């Protein structure tokens, strides 16, 4: 009888332990292990559609003085007309938490001249992670496999590294790429590439 009671007690403990266990589903987009942020080669930068002659000299940039102790937010929403007559829409939402850096800094965001990427200045490392929401609409994605499109850090040496985020969306017919809550640890150049292969099977990337 004592043996039966002991077995019953152990069984109940195991069942309670299983009920209290955390959800073990993997979300690579939102919580990529640090080891996965390795440099990748053989990538291809996704180009911006060529501007029409009337828009050729247009530059898309924004600057704002931010108190690092307070934090702040910068939103840039612009568009231009491509040479084929279609609109290219550009959106950036940069969120800077309080305590990200010390003192006042003039933060500047500049759209790259050729590729789907943004330059962020001044170059510095943060005490707290910045959050970036960024999208393009009206890109020519017909020749790309959507499963290999990703948002990355573009290093000065030509290499790229994956960026932790809460999800990447690719809508091929409308030429849309969108990243949610990309975690920026430092300022540099960030943008969109086609990788040579799918390095991690992000389960929450939605392709249409």
How would you name each of these model-derived features?
Residues 105-113:
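Low-complexity, Ser/Thr/Pro-rich intrinsically disordered linker/stalk segments at domain junctions
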Residues 128-132:
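Structural beta-strand segments of beta-rich domains
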Residues 112-120:
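Short beta-strand elements of extracellular/lumenal beta-sandwich folds
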Residues 133-137:
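Short edge beta-strand/loop segments characteristic of extracellular beta-sandwich folds
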Residues 14-17:
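C-terminal motif of bacterial Sec signal peptides marking the signal peptidase cleavage site
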Residues 19-89, 123-127, 140-208:
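Proteolytic cleavage junctions
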Residues 2-9:
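Sec-dependent signal peptide recognition
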Residues 96:
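B-type heme-binding environments
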């Amino acid at each position: 009888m004592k043996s039966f009671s002991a077995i019953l007690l152990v069984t109940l403990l195991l069942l309670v332990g299983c009920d209290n266990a955390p959800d073990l589903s993997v979300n690579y987009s939102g919580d990529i292990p640090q080891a996965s942020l390795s440099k990748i080669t053989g990538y291809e930068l996704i180009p911006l559609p060529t501007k029409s002659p009337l828009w050729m000299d247009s530059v898309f940039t924004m600057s704002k003085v931010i108190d690092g102790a307070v934090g702040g937010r910068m939103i840039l929403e612009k568009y231009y007309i491509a040479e084929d007559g279609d609109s290219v829409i550009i959106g950036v939402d940069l969120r800077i938490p309080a305590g990200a850096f010390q003192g006042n800094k003039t933060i500047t965001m500049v759209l790259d001249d050729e590729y789907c990427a943004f330059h962020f200045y001044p170059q510095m490392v943060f005490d707290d992670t910045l959050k970036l929401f960024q999208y393009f609409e009206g890109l020519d994605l017909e020749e790309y496999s959507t499963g290999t499109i990703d948002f990355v850090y573009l290093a000065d040496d030509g290499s790229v590294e994956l960026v932790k985020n809460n999800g990447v969306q690719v809508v091929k017919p409308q030429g849309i790429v969108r990243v949610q809550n990309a975690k920026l640890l430092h300022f540099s150049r960030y943008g969109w590439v086609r990788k040579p292969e799918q390095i991690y099977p992000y389960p929450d990337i939605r392709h249409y």
